[in-house]
Amino acid sequence: MKIIQYKNYVFSFLGKQNPLNNNSSQFLNCAFGKGDSNFRVRSNRKLVSKLFNNKKIIFVNQIHSSRIFFYDKTRPYDIKADGIITKNKNVLLGILTADCAPVILLGKEYFGILHVGWRGLLNNIILNAVNFFIKRGE
């Protein structure tokens, strides 16, 4: 696990290894539908939350698109998107990557994270996110 701090923001890049358990057979899979039970994935996500003062983690169901979800205070179930933007400093934003790239966006008030694959890149997910920030004076 790698943790980076920039100003008031903290970023973490998690691998499969569980930072709370040195047992090499304990993986920290946070993705549903990738081999672990839903119970195990939820437990792993709770462990990650625990590492960051039990803040709520906002995930979206990634669909390799250019869709971006704006999180304010409520999250409808099963949001399909590849980006999350918020100004709520009391939550964590989470995305999952393998061969796609994570892109982190920081403004004065808003912050976001994108899951960028070739489809999203081709369909301007980064440009859409940057325009969101610009329209809000970020």
Describe these PLM feature segments.
Residues M1-N23, L51:
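Conserved nucleotide-ligand handling architecture
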Residues Y9, N22, N90, D99-C100, ...:
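Surface-exposed, charge/polar-rich loops and edge strands
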Residues Q26-D36, R40:
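Contiguous C-terminal substrate-recognition/catalytic subdomains in enzyme active sites
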